[in-house]
Amino acid sequence: MIIGVVSGQEPEEATPSLSARSTVRWRTFVRTETSSAVFLLAAVAAALVWANVGPHSYEAVWQARFTVGFDTRRLSLTVHEWINSGLMSLFFFVVGLEARRDFDMGELRDRRWLLLSAIAGLGSMIVPALIFVLVNAGRESVHGWGTAMSTDTAFALGVLAVFGSRLPASLRAFLLSVSVVDDLVALLVIAVFYSDEIRLPALLVAVCALLAIALLRLAGVRGALYCAVLSVVVWVALHEAGVDPVVAGLAVGVLVAAYPAPRGDLEQASRLFRLFREQPTPELHRSAVQGLDAAISPNERLEQRFLPWVSFGIVPLFALANAGIELSGPALADAFTSPVTLGIVLGCVVGKVIGTVGSMAAARLLSGGRLRPNVGWGSVTVGGAIAGSAFTVSLLIASLAFDGAELEEARIGILVTLVGAFLTSWAVTAVIGLLPERRRARALLGDVDPLTDLAVPVDRRHDRIRGPESAVVTVVEYGDFECPYCGQAEPVVRDLLGQESDVRYVWRHLPLRDVHPRAQLAAEASEAAARQDRFWEMHDLLLERQNALAAPDLLRYAGELGLDVERFRQDLRDHLGARRVAEDVDSADLSRVSGTPTFFINGRRHHGAYDIAALTRAVELARQRALTG
């Protein structure tokens, strides 16, 4: 499933309890794509066992009807339909949220990459559909061509997580953007080719409700209630229009904007929390909670809220309801000689690779090289192979296109694609791993300059730099001497510099004065030490002794370092370092940095943990990119 990155570890002021450690381990587990893929596969296995041990009970459970409504307006669907058309709307909602976040803050900010991803998404659907049509030509089963088109986002990202650091992080953005195009087109295919007669009045209501959500978002109107009510209106209207309503989730998700937490909103949240701390009343509690919510983009809040339910509830439940197939020797033999099964397997496992690589190569050729993937062709091939995993949407289309024996054959083919996609992507990754280092880096990363997030480049005449000037990799940290997270990160950075000889480190000041009252003075103290050529010694000492940063403490540290204490005292009194600190703060604003620590590695913002393993992986990726330059 689609999982947000894990934030930096929390500083430990005391030994955590067993329950606290268990909670942390659980949260870490649920925030990985691998764990959600494990749940998905477990649900598939459970469905297969249930369908073969108790086939009658399996069918009875999912065909039971559930009705909602009042008076003459009632909606009666089977449990199977509620899951496929109702709960799965939330799955596509989360897909839409992450796609929008990547559009606003990630790789898709480069609109050329967005266009190329759309081309790759279309190519990776057209070729598999054509293969299915060729295999089923002249048969009634040819109308099920849509079954071979779609990629299962949950499984694809889970497979990508299994390969881990062997593949570039930007491949995830590529897979996600292709998957969104895939899902959009697949849902349009469902609406046009596999839905009942479309009723235009109800469809118009759905479009108007979507426009209302978009306009309210543009107007900056906050609040989950109106969005939830209008989303339900969209879903019901699409159902009444004869269109599979799962498209509602994706459409609403891409309308929810993502953005970094603005500094002003964070400072307001801190002020409201301090007021609550002084007077813990229900009214101030409500204000503090609202202030915290306002500081985080609705995109991130909604994904955080829905992601665990989707990853570990809805998607496995969908698999349990749809993957139950009665397996027997004759049934399997019939399936593997069936044009339906063969069309799906060949279309997904082979056609996805051909369609993805071929469409991107054609786009590069026809554009004269202006449209180039921001990953290497090896990564593109792996992405195409991983995209061959068909499950969620393919099962939806199969349930609409087939029945009886053909439906069972389609389900078997869809399950086979999961194994085929994994084995194919593993084989391609293994071959790439055998290449010499420089060729492997180019195959994985390509030759396109990555997007730069750091607005103000490193200047050796201005910045505080530790490490060789000729270093291949530059790590920039925006930090606060009173921030406990920065204190936790400092030994990690020192370990990184100790084990990586071609890395240099840059410290830039970002004192969070609203929560750390001594941070500004500490930053100025480090600059006063820099005027006596002892910046890094003072830097290390301040982060080591974060709980003692008052003016007398700073003067004592100056004495310990052998500085001219009177000169140091006068520099602090005159605030000679304030201008330099303000320049760093201004550069942080330009780079949309609002919290500490924030790391940039060769100009790219580092998202995720800042333990030694995570930073080492990020540095290695930056080094490989430098090798391809």
UniProtKB/Swiss-Prot annotation:
This is Na(+)/H(+) antiporter NhaA 2. GO terms for molecular function: sodium:proton antiporter activity. Na(+)/H(+) antiporter that extrudes sodium in exchange for external protons. The lineage of its organism: Bacteria, Bacillati, Actinomycetota, Actinomycetes, Kitasatosporales. It comes from Streptomyces coelicolor (strain ATCC BAA-471 / A3(2) / M145). PROSITE patterns: THIOREDOXIN_2. It is a multi-pass membrane protein. Gene3D superfamilies: Glutaredoxin (3.40.30.10), Na+/H+ antiporter like domain (1.20.1530.10). It is found in: Cell membrane.
